[in-house]
């Protein structure tokens, strides 16, 4: 994951000081891309320990179409708590948009089922896209989508995915986002009898928060270690039937975790 550390260095060297919604302040660059060949290992940051339980359960929560933190709490995941209301609701965030995008005529579109069908029937289509950026519902969301738009691509029997992330917290959020979409590519490839290809990450406002500078400096002193490998323990009936126990990460040997505050 050297390219992740290189991104940190770039933000530190070239970033513009900016105010932000949270009032914390950032160093920010605009427009950056990284490519991860998923054949070469699972892109889980090794220069600090990542909380894989949270990454997996959050993705399953998205795929279930849920927007209340109750499922996450049942599985000891608290990463969305800061934005939830007193009932645990977040409004029409990722799960709602992925699984039940509302149309003007009252229909709902299950975008995940739709792209799975497209990949089976029209793998060369240039329209195999999921969007969480529903302009008509942004004001109802506890947090507007950061990872907002992703596209799939099939070539030579391999499934690739590119994500556009309009806002990226490089220290805390980005390792989660990379691992989450890499997981999704592995799951979809298994369901479609394809090999995994590349995960391409594209960032818009790509930033380090001002209260993450010491943690970033510490992480940059550490040498990356070999990437782990993801093993899927079984093949469920559909993309929606995976369980936490289905994901086995082999050979993950990270440096110790580094704590940092979340900007809310």
Curated annotation (Swiss-Prot):
GO terms for biological process: dTMP biosynthetic process; dTTP biosynthetic process; methylation. DUMP binds at residues 21, 126-127, 166-169, 177, 207-209. Keywords: Cytoplasm, Methyltransferase, Nucleotide biosynthesis, Transferase. Pathway: Pyrimidine metabolism; dTTP biosynthesis. Catalyzes the reductive methylation of 2'-deoxyuridine-5'-monophosphate (dUMP) to 2'-deoxythymidine-5'-monophosphate (dTMP) while utilizing 5,10-methylenetetrahydrofolate (mTHF) as the methyl donor and reductant in the reaction, yielding dihydrofolate (DHF) as a by-product. This enzymatic reaction provides an intracellular de novo source of dTMP, an essential precursor for DNA biosynthesis. One of its GO terms (molecular function) is thymidylate synthase activity. It is an enzyme of class 2 (transferase). Homodimer. SUPFAM superfamilies: Thymidylate synthase/dCMP hydroxymethylase. The active site is at 146 (nucleophile). PANTHER family: THYMIDYLATE SYNTHASE (PTHR11548:SF9), THYMIDYLATE SYNTHASE 1 (PTHR11548). GO terms for cellular component: cytosol. The keyword Lyase does not apply. Pfam families: Thymidylat_synt (PF00303). This is Thymidylate synthase. Its EC number is 2.1.1.45. (6R)-5,10-methylene-5,6,7,8-tetrahydrofolate binds at residues 51, 169, 263. It is found in: Cytoplasm. NCBIfam families: PRK01827.1-3, PRK01827.1-5, thym_sym. It catalyses: dUMP + (6R)-5,10-methylene-5,6,7,8-tetrahydrofolate = 7,8-dihydrofolate + dTMP. Belongs to the thymidylate synthase family. Bacterial-type ThyA subfamily.
């Amino acid at each position: 994951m050297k390219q992740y550390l290189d991104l940190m260095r770039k933000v530190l060297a070239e970033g513009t000081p900016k105010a932000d919604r949270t009032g914390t302040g950032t160093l920010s660059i605009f427009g950056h891309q990284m490519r991860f060949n998923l054949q070469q290992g699972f892109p889980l940051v090794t220069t600090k320990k990542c909380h894989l339980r949270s990454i997996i359960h959050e993705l399953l929560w998205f795929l279930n179409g849920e927007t209340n933190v109750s499922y996450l709490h049942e599985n000891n995941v608290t990463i969305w708590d800061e934005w939830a209301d007193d009932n645990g609701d977040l409004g029409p965030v990722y799960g709602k948009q992925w699984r039940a995008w509302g149309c003007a005529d009252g229909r709902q579109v299950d975008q995940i089922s739709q792209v799975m069908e497209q990949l089976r029937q029209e793998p060369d289509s240039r329209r195999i896209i999921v969007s969480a950026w529903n302009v008509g519902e942004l004001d109802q969301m506890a947090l507007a989508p950061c990872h907002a738009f992703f596209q799939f691509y099939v070539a030579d029997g391999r499934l690739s995915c590119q994500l556009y992330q309009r806002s990226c917290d490089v220290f805390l959020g980005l390792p989660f986002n990379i691992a989450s979409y890499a997981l999704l590519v592995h799951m979809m490839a298994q369901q479609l009898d394809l090999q995994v290809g590349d995960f391409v990450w594209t960032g818009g406002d790509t930033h380090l928060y001002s209260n993450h500078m010491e943690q970033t400096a510490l992480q940059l002193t550490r040498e990356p270690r070999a990437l782990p490998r993801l093993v899927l323990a079984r093949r469920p009936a559909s993309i929606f039937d995976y369980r936490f126990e289905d994901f086995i990460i082999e050979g993950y040997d990270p440096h110790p975790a580094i704590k940092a505050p979340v900007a809310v």
